[in-house]
Each structure stands twice: as structure tokens, then as C-alpha cells.
């Protein structure tokens, strides 16, 4: 039986979250070279605790996909909801978000063409969540 593990945002997305104000208490961090590292058993840290002393140890906190999605929902009224879609070859997940202020659904790519869906479809739900989080941070916040 496979072990279920937490899915963390990528190093690039974690840096974007820090830049955009994500400051929750987290026990996982990214080192300056991009490796994921767990803090001591009961320790946690916030991005705002980053200073001259800690910069030698870590670059930014490493939230799970769910924490990042919840932060976007609570702080920015953006609900991430990838859709399962059928493509020419198989099934996959389409990045998608809902603007809760307008109650309007959006696909993150303006030029999206359903006839060429394979170009935008992610193989896994987690990759679709990551792609949508990154898009929202880069274009909406």
C-alpha cells in the first residue's frame, strides 16, 4: 500500500507566496538552494520571522497546497477548483479558479482553446492546484 504524503507548493510558488504576504506558522521550510526541510519536532516559523540570522538557514516557509489554497480563499476570495476533463488521449485536470467576489469561474489562460485542451491539462489534481495557485499569485494578487 502506498504511503500518503503531504503535497507542498514548489519552491518558486513558496517564494511568490512570501512576496504576496503569506505569513502562516509552518513547520516546513525551503532552504536557499530549494530543498525542502522540516524544522525540529515542535518548531514552526513564519515568513515574517525571516531575518539576518535565519537567512543562512532557510529562504521561505513551505506551505502545503491546501494551506495555500485556503489562504487564497480567505485572504483574497479566490477559490481553486480544478476540473476533471477528457482530452483527445485521456483524462486530466484543468486549472480553474472562482472569484468569490463576482461568483464567476475562470480558466487561468485567456487564450484557452478547448479544441487544444491537451496543452493546458495537468496530469494530476495536485499539479493543477499548483499551476492555478502560481497563476493567481502572478496575475491576480
Residues of each region from the PLM?
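Glycine-rich anion-binding surface patch
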Residues: 1-141
Amino acid at each position: 500500500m502506498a504511503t500518503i504524503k503531504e503535497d507542498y507548493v514548489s519552491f518558486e510558488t513558496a517564494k511568490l507566496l512570501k512576496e504576496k504576504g503569506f505569513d502562516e506558522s509552518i513547520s516546513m521550510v525551503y532552504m536557499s538552494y530549494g530543498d525542502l526541510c522540516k524544522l525540529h519536532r515542535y518548531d514552526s516559523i513564519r515568513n515574517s520571522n525571516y531575518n539576518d540570522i535565519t537567512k543562512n538557514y532557510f529562504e521561505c516557509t513551505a506551505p502545503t497546497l491546501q494551506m495555500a489554497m485556503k489562504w487564497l480563499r480567505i485572504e483574497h476570495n479566490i477559490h481553486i477548483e480544478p476540473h476533471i476533463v477528457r482530452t483527445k488521449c485521456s483524462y486530466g485536470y484543468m486549472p480553474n479558479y472562482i472569484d468569490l467576489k463576482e461568483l464567476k469561474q475562470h480558466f487561468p489562460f485567456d487564450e484557452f482553446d478547448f479544441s487544444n485542451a491537451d496543452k493546458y491539462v495537468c496530469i494530476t489534481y495536485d499539479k493543477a492546484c499548483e499551476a492555478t495557485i502560481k497563476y493567481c499569485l502572478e496575475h491576480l494578487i
